[in-house]
């Protein structure tokens, strides 16, 4: 470990310890300080276990908790961020809370909720094995800017990523990312079968209306919600993806 990384870990651990002694939350502040003094602070940690990241506009916290519960039920030691500190600073603080004085993180899996815009930042410095991408909606525009800009940011990261990518086949903005890296053979899709609340009538939404490859208006067999549903492009054939995992008989009553 370099002297700079050693200082980063020791200083960070002292901050966490001090905050705990004062009865204060160490959720985000230590990571914010470390990012200020060392932009490569995540590289100071030694994480030898697989990292699973969950991202998307909606549902990150729930899916992260589901996956963590599944792994823990199998007897695995899990480190996760159930309270949603999902920015680079929050993830840095999480690792500080769980590492030893040499920056070593001991677990069977890290399951990390991660803000979409921070995926490239965090996982250019941590060795990610699996990225789960749920959806893209416009309800975070005030924070992340135009949704297409955000999608392209994630796409650029995926162009060189060769780990597992788990994508929502029912969201055209997510499904398109399965083609970001033609050399990655670890692309997997999931889907939710039509449920009782689905409709044949389109929602008034901007995202997911046109094919991302040929700009033709997409045809939907049905809409689950907003632009999420069974879709295909009548011109280039994008869509109608056969998922590896499909959730059936969804009962929301």
Question: Which ranges hold each PLM region?
Answer:
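Phosphate-binding loop of NTP-binding sites
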Residues: 2-191, 198-213
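Adenine nucleotide phosphate-binding catalytic loops in nucleotide-utilizing enzymes
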Residues: 188-253
């Amino acid at each position: 470990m370099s002297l700079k990384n050693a200082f980063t870990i020791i200083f960070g651990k002292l901050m966490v310890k001090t905050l705990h002694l004062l009865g204060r939350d160490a959720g985000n502040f230590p990571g914010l300080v470390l990012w200020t003094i060392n932009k490569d602070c995540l590289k100071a940690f030694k994480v030898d276990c697989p990292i699973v990241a969950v991202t998307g506009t909606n549902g990150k916290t729930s899916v992260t908790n589901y996956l963590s519960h599944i792994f823990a039920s199998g007897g695995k030691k899990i480190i996760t961020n159930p309270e949603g500190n999902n920015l680079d600073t929050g993830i840095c603080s999480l690792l500080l809370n769980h590492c030893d004085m040499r920056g070593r993180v001991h677990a069977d899996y890290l399951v990390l909720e991660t803000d979409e815009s921070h995926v490239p930042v965090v996982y250019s410095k941590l060795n990610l094995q699996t990225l789960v991408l749920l959806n893209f909606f416009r309800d975070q525009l005030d924070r992340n800017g135009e949704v297409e800009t955000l999608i392209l940011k994630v796409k650029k990261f995926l162009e060189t990523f060769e780990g597992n990518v788990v994508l929502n086949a029912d969201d055209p903005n997510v499904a398109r990312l399965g083609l970001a890296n033609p050399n990655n053979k670890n692309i997997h899709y999931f889907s939710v079968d039509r449920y009782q609340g689905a409709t044949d009538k389109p929602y008034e939404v901007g995202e997911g209306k046109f094919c991302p490859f040929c700009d033709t208006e997409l045809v939907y067999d049905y809409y689950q919600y907003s632009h999420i549903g069974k879709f295909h492009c009548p011109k280039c054939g994008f869509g109608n993806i056969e998922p590896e995992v499909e959730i059936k008989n969804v009962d929301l009553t």
